[in-house]
Design a protein with these regions (language model features):
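Short loop->beta-strand "edge-of-pocket" segments that line small-molecule binding or catalytic clefts
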Residues: 78-88, 167-188
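Structural motif
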Residues: 84-90, 110, 129-132, 156-158, ...
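Flexible hinge/capping segments at coil-to-helix
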Residues: 146, 150-151, 155-178
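Conserved small/polar residues in nucleotide/adenosyl-binding loops
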Residues: 193
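N-terminal hydrophobic or amphipathic helices and topogenic motifs
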Residues: 1-110
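Structural motif corresponding to alpha-helix initiation and N-cap regions
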Residues: 112-113, 167
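Short beta-strand-centered segments that line the small-molecule binding cleft or hinge
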Residues: 113-155
Length: 193
């Protein structure tokens, strides 16, 4: 129904949440992304809406999702532009060295629901997450452990937690946030499924 490029314009716009980033990922200009995304949405009688930095579509998505499945099978079968992304703080270690056919996202998801929705809708092909947020194996997703070693908490020798006399628990770490994000870097509202 749609050629790979036209549907990719819509999907990259939804995935990357920016016409500029979608254009960079597809090696074209923003006007081309916008025009193609709009034509797909109009053809399927869908209403695109950007709310708090994230794109969503309203209307009957059944035909679009079927078309996405076909395009995803094509990407998998022919190794074409397979899309991968990650939760904030995880992706750079794994994704920096990936080469074609992988297309890497910005690894700026702070929630689980949005990337899982992108996986369900065949917009993403793979996503790197962290426990306990990743789903258990089910009919829809396969979880592949990339490391068998636990994460550790590293601090400076002068950190206040080292002054405690009792064994540390995970709750003790909550008073010391580790992410430093610029204002407005991420949407305030996430998609729920």
């Amino acid at each position: 129904m749609f050629d790979v490029f036209r549907l990719s314009c819509l999907d990259y716009l939804i995935w990357l949440r920016s016409g500029k980033d979608a254009a960079l990922g597809l090696n074209c200009n923003q006007a081309t992304v916008s025009r193609n995304a709009k034509s797909v949405a109009e053809f399927l009688d869908l209403d695109p809406c950007k709310l708090e930095g994230e794109w969503s579509l309203s209307g009957d998505l059944s035909l679009l999702n079927a078309e996405r499945k076909v395009h995803q099978l094509y990407r998998w079968a022919y190794g074409k532009s397979m899309r991968i992304d990650a939760v904030y703080g995880v992706g750079s270690d794994y994704l920096n060295e990936l080469r074609q056919p992988w297309v890497c996202g910005p690894s700026n998801f702070l929630n689980v629901s949005y990337p899982l929705a992108l996986l369900r809708e065949s917009i993403l092909d793979a996503w790197l997450g962290c426990y306990p947020d990743v789903p258990v194996d089910d009919d829809e997703f396969v979880v592949i452990n990339l490391t068998r070693y636990p994460s550790v908490f590293l601090v400076d020798q002068q950190h206040p937690l080292l002054q405690r006399k009792v064994e540390l628990k995970l709750d003790d770490l909550q008073d010391f946030p580790v992410l430093s994000l610029p204002d407005g870097a991420f949407p305030k509202i996430c998609l729920l499924y």
